[in-house]
Amino acid sequence: MRLESVAKFHSPKSPMMSDSPRATASDSLSGTDVMAAMGMAQSQAGFGMAAFCGKHELSQNDKQKAINYLMQFAHKVSGKYRGVAKLEGNTKAKVLQVLATFAYADYCRSAATPGARCRDCHGTGRAVDIAKTELWGRVVEKECGRCKGVGYSRMPASAAYRAVTMLIPNLTQPTWSRTVKPLYDALVVQCHKEESIADNILNAVTR
């Protein structure tokens, strides 16, 4: 069973998994089985489960839990980033909270996010390769150059920068780019890593 099945399980528009045998093991899981598997996955990959469930609007509580997990991670690695490491206690905590909140919002974006769908590929992540289409006489697709194949635009890091400057007014754009933004980017990446870990664990416990 994969994490995407959890989202379908919680969707009222999707058929619930039942006890009747189906084509795959995850399809034959009962509601009780699914909840038990989620509990096991949460005990081993709480960050990833909270991040995913919050991302798919399954729980508002999970959104806050994911941000809290991300803040803990940010505190742990902040010493590697000069622009954050030198900050005083209260200011540092507030900056990390801002970075974690914006990073999680970026992770949550998808083609379904209002205003985020790529204008070139309309959320598919694919675009027509005009040169090869003309050369071969048939439609040839390629990865969308605008969105890099994901189907949507990322949240502009400038939004996080503006929020951080409310706490650090003298933070210049170049300094942000060199000493703070790398941490912001690392937080976004960590969300995806934790989701992948949770996905693998959930798959393992439902085999």
Swiss-Prot record:
Assigned keywords, A-Z: DNA-binding, Host-virus interaction, Metal-binding, Transcription, Transcription regulation, Transcription termination, Zinc, Zinc-finger
According to UniProt, where does the site described as Interaction with host RNA polymerase sigma factor RPOD lie? E134
**GO MF terms on file?**
DNA binding; zinc ion binding
Q: Which residues bind DNA?
A: 171-192
Residues with site note (Interaction with host rpoB): T101, A160, T165
Q: Where are the zinc fingers (unnamed)?
A: 118-147
Q: Which Pfam families match?
A: Antiterm (PF03589)
Q: Where is this region: Disordered?
A: 1-28
Q: Name one GO biological process term.
A: DNA-templated transcription termination
Residues folding into a coiled coil are: none
Quote the record's binding site residues for Zn(2+).
Answer: C118, C121, C144, C147
- Biological role stated in the UniProt entry: Mediates the switch from middle to viral late gene expression by associating with host RNA polymerase (RNAP) so that the latter can read without pausing and through transcription terminators preceding late genes. Competes with host factor sigma 70 for binding to RPOB, the beta-subunit of host RNAP. To join the elongation complex, binds a specific DNA Q-binding element (QBE) and interacts with RNAP that is paused during early elongation. Participates in the lysis-lysogeny decision by activating the expression of the late lytic genes.
Per UniProt, subunit arrangement is: Interacts with host RPOB (via flap domain); this interaction renders host RNAP resistant to transcription pausing and allows it to read through termination signals. Interacts with host RNA polymerase sigma factor RPOD (via domain-4). Interacts with host NUSA (via N-terminus and AR2 domain); this interaction releases the autoinhibition of NUSA.
Q: Which family does it belong to?
A: Belongs to the phage antitermination Q type 2 family.
What is the protein name for this chain?
A: Antitermination protein Q
Organism field: Escherichia phage lambda (Bacteriophage lambda)
Q: What is the lineage of its organism?
A: Viruses, Duplodnaviria, Heunggongvirae, Uroviricota, Caudoviricetes
